[in-house]
């Protein structure tokens, strides 16, 4: 994902525009009902066009880039504990390494323990 002037200007694996900074989408989105419907409609369009092998990012990209400024935003999660879960081994990695970090940070936030 590429950001320029605090707006998402690209949302794909290859870059085609200038940007101030870039980052990776972790694939978690909070959408309004209207935006969810637009993504569904765009997905249906891709399917009707026979574009069944496109990455999901392309559909989201189309909706982001055709929406008015300010509709979509991003969060910088640099340094926050997270893991992409694709396989069973990733679940175990999350359980053993990520979850304890999240719980520790939560305890620190609430003043329940000393930092480790």
What is each stretch, according to the model?
Residues 1-46:
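Conserved core of the sugar-phosphate nucleotidyltransferase
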Residues 34, 38, 44-116:
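Left-handed beta-helix
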């Amino acid at each position: 994902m590429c950001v320029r002037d605090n707006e998402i200007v690209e949302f794909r694996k290859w870059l085609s525009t200038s940007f101030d900074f870039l980052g990776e989408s972790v694939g978690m989105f909070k959408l309004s009902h209207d935006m969810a419907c637009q993504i569904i409609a765009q997905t249906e369009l891709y399917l009707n066009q026979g574009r069944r092998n496109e990455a999901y990012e392309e559909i989201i990209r189309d909706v982001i880039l055709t929406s008015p400024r300010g509709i979509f935003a991003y969060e910088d999660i640099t340094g926050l504990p997270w893991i992409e879960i694709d396989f069973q081994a990733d679940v175990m990695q999350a359980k053993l390494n990520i979850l304890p970090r999240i719980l520790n940070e939560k305890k620190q936030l609430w003043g329940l323990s000393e930092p480790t």
